Amino acid sequence: KLNQKYQIVWATGPKQFDIVKEELKKSSIDIEKVPNAKILPYIYNMEEIMNISDIIVARSGAMTITEISNLGKPSILIPLPNVSQDHQLRNAEVLQKIGAAQIILNNELEKDILNKEIIEIASNKAKMKEMGEKASTKSVKNVQEKIYAEIKKIVKGGK
């Protein structure tokens, strides 16, 4: 459904790439022939891909949440289950609570649910904009300058 209207870039991770492609073939989906869809083992220019994306569908590790916030993007987050202290769910909830993200739990993830969430957000430009603006409120501005200032203090013997 989505591939006709939206461009999809899917990074599986190197270990899962062949497995995912094989599972898609078993489901009669030849991803190589799907227009506007690209499946990759890894994305080396993630910030660039995220920057040109309208909606980000991703796991919710700390770096991903930071990138989403810094770029001011609406997102659908699928926390990785069984991680230390359930930190990915807690990360995702930070954006969900302010209306910047939707969460789909891994055990509830089905194509129809994901389709519905993507279409619901993408079909409402005002909602997309609002979610992006809310995400950017969690962005830490001037991080490099702040880190540099702290390092200078430490080097000079200050606290």
Residue ranges and their predicted role:
Residues 1-55, 89-93, 97, 104-113:
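Donor-nucleotide binding loops and adjacent catalytic segments primarily
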Residues 120, 127-141:
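A short, well-ordered alpha-helix in the C-terminal region of glycosyltransferases
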Residues 49, 110-114, 131, 143-147:
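Hydrophobic alpha-helical packing elements
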